[in-house]
UniProtKB/Swiss-Prot annotation:
Component of the FERRY complex, composed of five subunits: TBCK, PPP1R21, FERRY3, CRYZL1 and GATAD1, with a ratio of 1:2:1:2:4 respectively. PPP1R21 serves as a binding hub connecting all five complex subunits to mediate the binding to specific mitochondrial mRNAs. Interacts with the GTP-bound form of RAB5A (via its C-terminal region); linking the mRNP complex onto trafficking endosomes for active mRNA transport. Interacts with PPP1CA. Residues 84-104 are annotated as: Disordered. Transmembrane segments: none annotated. Disulfide bonds: none annotated. This is Protein phosphatase 1 regulatory subunit 21. It holds the Pfam family PPP1R21_helical. Expressed at 16 dpc in the cortex (at protein level). The modification Phosphothreonine is found at residue 652. GO terms for molecular function: RNA binding. Component of the FERRY complex (Five-subunit Endosomal Rab5 and RNA/ribosome intermediary). The FERRY complex directly interacts with mRNAs and RAB5A, and functions as a RAB5A effector involved in the localization and the distribution of specific mRNAs most likely by mediating their endosomal transport. The complex recruits mRNAs and ribosomes to early endosomes through direct mRNA-interaction. In the complex, PPP1R21 serves as a binding hub connecting all five complex subunits and mediating the binding to mRNA and early endosomes via RAB5A. Residues 95-104 have a biased composition (Low complexity). It is found in: Early endosome. Residues 1-209, 556-605, 694-742 form a coiled coil.
Length: 780
């Protein structure tokens, strides 16, 4: 895998290198083209300069010509000024000469005028040529500057690409060396993998044999134990009992319960809407208590009076449908027989709406023809008539689709199963349309009611009736919106659970087969129930519940424990208050006891010694009298308790007036001591809170600084790791280059050693030859 990754990286780098080479060639070509275009522009600039010089020369010649013409004009004007007085003197004598002078003057004037026009034209041409030259020169200079900058940029890009190419080449060479090393290791791994594949093939063969045996066994079990599956007559397959899906049944019952609740909200709103509409007809535009209403409105009121017989069955039909969906049944379109009843009730209500629609439209037209109807009210009535038509059409559409939904439970061949997706989608669209039209009715009726309230003859009864109709319309709007959103949220679930038959089938199962299937399901459930034997209880239910509670209490969360601590603190504070109360009561009771003992002692001292015979009787009656007095005093002095945040206080009636001062002093001292104690505790708590707040602020600052330092350290660590990896790569490349250089140097040294040894041998041979020659010469 590592070699494959490196090979892929190498191929990517080679592709990038080829792309960069192609880009480099394109950039070089662009630079050459730009240089050629800049040279052409320079040539054009030279040509423009030459044309400018020519134009300047022409301008100079024209200015010179203009000066000559101006001088000539001055001379002609002077001659004309001299000729005018002469003409006056010789006016009588020389009429012929004056005519000649006039002709010459006219000729001169025409010549002068032509010269002036020519001069003006030349000035204009010169100015236009000068402006055009300046404009062209500026454009060429700007284009030259842009081309120079682009050429510099292209050159910089080329330099950068060449540097990048060199770096890429070096990196590719190093990667190639790594890949060669890894390829050798991968070859070894490939050999090991071949051995492993041979072992795996043997294991696969054994597993295949084992699984084929298991498959044959499973197929035999399926053929014996699977429900009846007739491939020739599919009608028999409808008698198979499907798997019981309790979750599906519970969800269907929940959905039916929600639908029942929505219908129960809609039915009273519809009843109120029709009833208050009937009441309004009796009031406006003609009050039936004062005058007779029109026959049309009488008939309309009679029909509206029957609305309950059409509206209430809708709720009853939905209730029967809800009761038919239980946990033991299979709820699909073939088994929901009660949906047909709801569809019939909805059809009767739609007929009722069709019956009252013409009367409602005519009643609104009659209101428009009334003298009390203003143009604004007439416009609102027209909008309401259109809304009523739309509402009836929406209910007709909804009734059509609900009837189609009830078909599978009565006529399964009426419509294919694939078409019911669009049927359910259209039901949702019809419900949304009902919501929209009810919003329009509420809006338009609100505007109509506000206009009618401004009529001077509007009675309080009319205002109240309009408010009731408007509130019922708003209720209908809210209910329709809830039903539309509810159906839109569950339409996918309805589509997924249309039938209990095979999913590949195109039609529905007949209602008779569905009924038989439900009977078989009940029989199968009864049979399974008879087979089930009750299990012996391992742990009593009460003990299991107690253990579960203990387990849950032992695994409470932090919030639960905090709540328990808070409750414990509250209990402790209440107990402290009760403790203070009873301490105060004990002190008061002690004072009462001392007073009572003193009173009894005073009474005993008042007895005289002359009453000795009745002493025993008196001693016997004193405790009884004292006990009676105490009981009476206790009854008369029934304490009244009052509680507060500090403690509880017991108040007694004014019969103990002598003890009030001492009691008040005692209570005052007690509360002063308590207030001083609470004040000291409050000050201590405030100082602790200030200290804790300062510590928290310091800790938060330290935390922020620590987070910042952590971020900086992580960034530094990342940079350091990058530097380390870069330095390691550089070290590897330099090491490899040094090793290559050393190998080259060692080869070079070997070759040099060989050449040196050869040269030494040649030198030795030459020395030997020279020695032999010298000996020969000496011998000679």
């Amino acid at each position: 895998m590592a070699s494959a990754e490196l090979q892929g990286k190498y191929q990517k780098l080679a592709q990038e290198y080829s792309k960069l080479r192609a880009q480099n060639q394109v950039l070089k070509k662009g630079v050459v083209d730009e240089q050629a275009s800049s040279a052409a522009l320079k040539e054009q600039l030279k040509m423009k300069d030459q044309s400018l010089r020519k134009l300047q020369q022409e301008m100079d010649s024209l200015t010179f010509r203009n000066l000559q013409l101006a001088k000539r004009v001055e001379l002609l004007q002077d001659e004309l000024a001299l000729s005018e007085p002469r003409g006056k003197k010789n006016k009588k004598s020389g009429e012929s000469s004056s005519q000649l002078s006039q002709e010459q003057k006219s000729v001169f004037d025409e010549d002068l005028q032509k010269k002036i026009e020519e001069n003006e034209r030349l000035h204009i041409q010169f100015f236009e040529a000068d402006e055009h030259h300046r404009h062209v020169e500026a454009e060429l200079r700007s284009r030259l500057a842009t081309l120079e900058t682009e050429a510099a940029q292209h050159q910089a890009v080329i330099d950068g690409l060449t540097r990048k190419y060199m770096e890429t080449i070096e990196k590719l060479q190093s990667d190639k060396a790594k890949l060669e090393v890894k390829s050798q290791t991968l070859e070894k791994e490939a050999k090991e993998c071949r051995l492993r594949t041979e072992e795996c093939q043997l294991q696969l063969k054994n597993l295949h044999e084992d699984l084929s045996g298991r498959l044959e066994e499973s197929l035999s079990i399926i053929n014996e134990k699977v429900p009846f599956n007739d491939t020739k007559c599919h009608l028999y397959n409808a008698l198979n009992v499907p798997l019981h899906n309790r979750r599906h049944q519970l969800k269907m019952r929940d959905i039916a319960g929600q639908a029942l609740a929505f219908v129960q909200d809609l039915v009273p709103a519809l009843l109120n809407f029709h009833t208050y509409t009937e009441q309004r007809i009796q009031i406006f535009p003609v009050d039936s208590a004062i005058d007779t209403i029109s026959p049309l409105n009488q008939k309309f009121s009679q029909y509206l009076h029957e609305n309950a017989s059409y509206v209430r069955p809708l709720e009853e039909g939905m209730l029967h449908l809800f009761e038919s969906i239980t946990e033991d049944t299979v709820t699909v379109l073939e088994t929901t027989v009660k949906l047909k009843m709801f569809s019939d009730h909805l059809t009767s209500y739609v007929r009722f709406l069709r019956k009252i629609l013409p009367y409602q439209l005519k009643s609104l037209e009659e209101e428009c023809e009334s003298s009390l109807c203003t143009p604004a009210l007439r416009a609102r009535n027209l909008e309401l008539s259109q809304d009523m038509k739309t509402m009836t059409a929406v209910f007709e559409k909804l009734q059509t689709y609900v009837t189609l939904l009830a078909l599978p439970s009565t006529e399964p061949d009426g419509l294919l199963r694939t078409n019911y997706t669009s049927v359910l989608t259209n039901v949702g669209a019809a419900l949304h349309g009902f919501h929209d039209v009810m919003k329009d009715i509420s809006k338009h009726y609100s505007q109509k009611a506000s206009i009618e309230h401004e009529i001077p003859t509007a009675t309080q009864k009319l205002v109240t009736t309009n408010d009731c109709i408007l509130s019922s319309a708003v209720t209908l709007t809210n209910g329709a919106g809830k039903i539309a959103s509810f159906f839109g949220n569950n339409v996918d679930y309805f589509i997924a659970s249309l039938s209990y038959g095979p999913k590949t089938a195109s039609g529905f199962i007949s209602p008779l087969s569905a009924e038989c299937m439900l009977q078989y399901k009940k029989k199968a459930a009864a049979y399974m129930k008879s087979l089930r034997t009750p299990l012996a209880e391992s742990v009593p239910y009460g003990e299991a519940v107690a253990n579960r509670r203990v387990l849950l209490s032992s695994t409470e969360s932090r919030e639960g424990l905090a709540q328990q601590v808070q409750q414990s603190l509250e209990k402790i504070s209440k107990l402290e208050q009760e403790k203070e109360h009873w301490m105060l009561e004990a002190q008061l009771a002690k004072i009462k006891l001392e007073k009572e003992n003193q009173r009894i002692a005073d009474r005993l001292r008042g007895t005289t010694s002359a009453q000795l015979p009745g002493l025993a009787q008196e001693n016997a009656t004193v405790p009884i009298a004292s006990s009676q007095e105490e009981a009476a005093a206790k009854v008369l002095t029934e304490p009244v308790q009052s509680t507060s945040l500090v403690g509880m206080l017991t108040r007694t009636p004014d019969s103990e007036a002598p003890d009030v001062e001492s009691r008040e002093d005692l209570i005052k001292s007690h509360y002063m001591a308590r207030i001083a104690e609470l004040t000291s505790q409050l000050q201590l708590a405030d100082s602790k809170s200030v200290h804790f707040y300062a510590e928290c602020r310091a800790l938060s600052k330290r935390l922020a600084l620590a987070e910042k330092s952590k971020e900086t350290l992580t960034e530094e660590m990342r940079l350091a790791s990058q530097n380390i990896s870069r330095l390691q790569d550089e070290l590897m490349t330099t090491k490899r280059s040094y090793e290559d250089q050393l190998s080259m140097m060692s080869d070079h040294l070997c070759s040099m050693n060989e050449t040196l040894s050869k040269q030494r041998e040649e030198i030795d041979t030459l020395k030997m030859a020279s020695k032999g020659n010298s000996k020969k010469t000496r011998n000679r």
